[in-house]
Every structure is written in structure tokens, then in C-alpha cells.
Amino acid sequence: MSQFFEAATPVAIPTNNTNGGSSDAGSAATGGAPVVGTTAQPTINHRLLLSLKEAAKIIGTKGSTISRIRAANSVKIGISEKVPGCSDRILSCAGNVINVANAIGDIVDVLNKRNPENEDAAEGEAEEHYYFHFLNHILPAPSKDEIRDLQQLEDIGYVRLIVANSHISSIIGKAGATIKSLINKHGVKIVASKDFLPASDERIIEIQGFPGSITNVLIEISEIILSDVDVRFSTERSYFPHLKKSSGEPTSPSTSSNTRIELKIPELYVGAIIGRGMNRIKNLKTFTKTNIVVERKDDDDKDENFRKFIITSKFPKNVKLAESMLLKNLNTEIEKRENYKRKLEAAEVDATVVTERSDSASFLEEKEEPQKNHDNKEEQS
């Protein structure tokens, strides 16, 4: 039986649009309305691999398209700078889980749209073969046998989601159970690349389907990543577009850096600084364009109360910015815990005062009772 692509059905989340979701992503042709959450949602930062043409299309004329997506979904979106000689760029999208998923659904919708004035060029772009093989589709193009409404065939799009290798197994699940469930539930196709992106510990998860369906499956993938208990405070390297060395070995941000700073962060605050699913530290790395490595804690480590953070970049000002932001986050966390501690102490003092007053009142009542009895006896006599 053929796999049918399915239009998205809204997930069990309130759909009154308080964040101004894009109307384009909610059309029937693109697979259903995007979901919008009204309650506080956990935050995530997703990264997509783009070709130069795709990046230009998402940016739009004078940045109009990316600005619209950013404003409509209340997210932070940025695209890495062009690296001479490289055919790829990275899009980062950060915000709460649902808004990020909606924004990426809008991105798929933008990439699906073709220029009616130049259909031949659009066809040529779709069939282009890239030297950087990660840009080539892993999944075959959708066929007429896989869709019930042939008019919607061209509305099927795809994303190349960059995911740390430590999360891939959780997304796939035991014997592929999780990824099969996502495919069947949302009417999409999903596949993980076998190869790692150059000089990194990340792989590509390619998702193919209607924009609305991709939105919904991204929400579940985000939840899997955020709840992944096997998160390692590791030396996992993030991928950045770069050229290879003449020897054939890729140049990674960590090996090409000429500026390096090491910070020791108290172990008590490491979890808060890194954030859930390493989300906070990833956002910091993306914003400052640096590579930040959190060293693993060894059993024989002499500084057992501290963890080493290593910041590297070929731009000294970026390293300094990352250092100042990291220390600011640390000071904020320390101050937050101190304030909480003071509030607890104040509450304990208030409770003690109330108890003392209650004891005093009880003592006075006990003292007044015999006096009343004595007065009553005198009146009777």
C-alpha cells in the first residue's frame, strides 16, 4: 500500500491566534492551519540547512520575507553569512516550540512558491544537483500515487533539520517505532542522514510533507529533544559552513580559532547556564557566532566544584561578547537564587513572629481566665 501524504489536522492546542500566525501557512493547499499556543511553552532553537538560492528566497527583497515570518510568529530568525566558496547557509529559528514550528511551516510555504514569470528557471532549480551532497534530497520526490489530490502535489515541501547525533536515536526510537509513529500520524516522510555534517557531531533529518504537517511533526520532534534524558554536557560540535583545508581535512571553528578563553563555572549553576536540552548555551553560541564547549566532568577531576567552559572564535570581539554574556547569565542566576533564599528566610521569620504572637495571646487568655473566675466569685458573695 502506498504512503499517502496527509493534510495537517490541528493538534490539541488552543487555536485562537494571539501571535499573528501567517495566513499563507494556514491555507488548505498547504496542509491546514498552523497551531498557536496561548499558554507558556518551552523554548527551542532549530537550525535548517539551506542552499544559497533557498536562503535568498527566504530573506526576500530587502529582507521583507524573513521579517514578515519573524514578526508573524514572534520568533528570532537569522541566517548565517555567506562563506566564499560554500554553497550552503544555516537558518536559526528560536522561540517557543509552537511559534518556531509555525515559522518553519511558513518557510516551507515560501520555498514551495515558484516564480510564475519564469517556470523554466523554477524547474531547473528543483532539479539542481549540489556538489555539497547534504543539500541533495535524501528522499525521492513525491509521486502522483502518494497523494489523493493531484492539485496539491506541488504544495509538498521539505526541510533539512540539523540535529545533534545524541538526539537522533530518541527521534528514531526503539526499532524505529517513534519515527514510524510520526510518519503515520502526520502523513509525512522522515529520514535521517547516515553521514555527519563536516567537522561536527550533527546530522540531517529530512522531513517531506505539507507545510502544516511539517509544523505539527516539528512540535513533537521538539518535545522529544527537550525531554531527552540522555543529554550530554559534551564536546558535541555544531556545524558551520566552511571550506576544506588543502589536505582535504575540513576546517572547524574550534581548530581554526586564534582566540580562546576558558571559564570555570560553579557546578551548582552549570545546569541553569546550559539550559534544558542545552538550549540556552546553543542560543548563546548562535548569537555570538562562537564555539562553546562544556568539558565533561571526570571522576579524577581536582576542581570537582567547577566545570570548564571553553569559548573559541577567530574573531576576538565575538569571544569577549560570549564571555561577558556567559558571566552575566551566571551573575543573574546567582542573584536569582540569593533573592529566593532571602524570601524563604523572611517567610521563616514571619512564621516565627506569628507563632510567638499566638503563644503570647494564648498565655494572656490563660492568665485572664482565673482573674475572671475570681471576680465572679466576689460578685456572688
From Swiss-Prot:
Compartments where located: Cytoplasm; Cytoplasm, P-body; Nucleus; Chromosome, Telomere
A Gene Ontology cellular-component term: P-body
One GO BP: regulation of translation
SMART domains: KH
GO molecular function, one term: RNA binding
Annotated KH domain residues: 43-107, 156-221, 258-326
Pfam families, per database record: KH_1
Main location: cytoplasm
SUPFAM superfamilies assigned: Eukaryotic type KH-domain (KH-domain type I)
Region of interest (Disordered), residue spans: 1-34, 357-381
Family: Belongs to the HEK2 family.
Summary of the function given for this chain in its UniProt record: RNA-binding protein involved in the correct localization of transcripts in the cell. RNA localization is a widespread mechanism for achieving localized protein synthesis. Required for the asymmetric localization to the daughter cell nucleus of the ASH1 transcript, coding for a specific repressor of transcription. Overexpression inhibits translation of the ASH1 transcript. Involved in the stability of transcripts, like the MTL1 mRNA. Involved in structural and functional organization of telomeric chromatin and regulates silencing at the HMR locus.
Protein name in UniProt: Heterogeneous nuclear rnp K-like protein 2
Annotated source species: Saccharomyces cerevisiae (strain RM11-1a)
